[in-house]
């Protein structure tokens, strides 16, 4: 069985799926370019029940994202990098499981994955790597020409991640500076 590595080419991503990973709630957002505009195609959350077993919860995430890949011709998946704290190693391990099935869904769909640290997403969106969530939500609202600030936070974060993926994949100069 051969291994194929899929990588994104600069300037080649016109439909991007942004993912804010979580075992309980995974936020996702699909954006695409229509002429000079960026358009939000779909956004939402995939929720798993805390009462389900870990494999059942992971399957729920995988099935949900596989459905998104089946509906949209995604060119690139932008995934928030794992953030962990030494006080909560168990949380980091569980998040690693969630990120694993998210990456599996992308690989199964033949979609390349780019990983972005939360501070990088914030810097690309606002110029400040420590920007508060409210500032990120406002930036997303303005850049996608939305009527209101996106809610819940998982969806807003996924939108920001997809926008970051778009800007960095389509502008190599920004990628070098970010």
UniProtKB/Swiss-Prot annotation:
Primary location group: cytoplasm
Subcellular compartments: Cytoplasm
Pfam families: RuvC (PF02075)
Binding of Mg(2+) 2, residues: 80
Catalytic activity, as annotated: Endonucleolytic cleavage at a junction such as a reciprocal single-stranded crossover between two homologous DNA duplexes (Holliday junction)
Cofactor(s) named in the record: Mg(2+)
Binding sites annotated in the UniProt record for Mg(2+) 1: 20, 154
Uppermost EC category: hydrolase
Family membership: Belongs to the RuvC family.
Cofactor binding annotation: Binds 2 Mg(2+) ion per subunit.
Organism of derivation: Rhodopirellula baltica (strain DSM 10527 / NCIMB 13988 / SH1)
Protein origin, superkingdom: Bacteria
The encoding gene: ruvC
E.C. numbers: 3.1.21.10
Biological processes annotated in GO: DNA recombination; DNA repair
Zinc-finger is among the record's keywords: no
Keywords: Cytoplasm, DNA damage, DNA recombination, DNA repair, DNA-binding, Endonuclease, Hydrolase, Magnesium, Metal-binding, Nuclease
Active-site residues, Swiss-Prot/TrEMBL: 20, 80, 154
Gene Ontology MF terms in the entry: crossover junction DNA endonuclease activity; DNA binding; magnesium ion binding
UniProt name for this protein: Crossover junction endodeoxyribonuclease RuvC
Record-annotated membrane-spanning stretches: none
GO cellular component, as recorded: cytoplasm; Holliday junction resolvase complex
């Amino acid at each position: 069985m051969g291994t194929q590595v899929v990588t994104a080419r600069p300037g080649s991503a016109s439909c991007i799926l942004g993912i804010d990973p979580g075992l309980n709630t995974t936020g996702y957002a699909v954006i695409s370019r229509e002429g000079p505009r960026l358009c939000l195609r779909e956004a939402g959350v995939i929720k798993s029940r805390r009462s389900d077993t870990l494999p059942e919860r992971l399957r729920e995430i995988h099935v949900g994202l596989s459905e998104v890949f089946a509906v949209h011709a995604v060119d690139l998946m932008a995934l928030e990098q794992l953030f962990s704290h030494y006080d909560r190693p168990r949380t980091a391990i569980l998040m690693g499981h969630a990120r694993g099935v998210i990456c599996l869904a992308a690989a199964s769909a033949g979609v390349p994955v780019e990983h972005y640290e939360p501070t990088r997403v914030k810097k690309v969106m606002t110029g400040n790597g420590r920007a508060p969530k409210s500032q990120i939500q406002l930036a997303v609202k303005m850049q996608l020409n939305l009527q209101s600030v996106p809610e819940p936070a998982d969806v807003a974060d996924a939108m920001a991640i997809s926008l970051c993926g778009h800007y960095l994949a389509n502008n190599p100069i920004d990628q070098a500076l970010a």
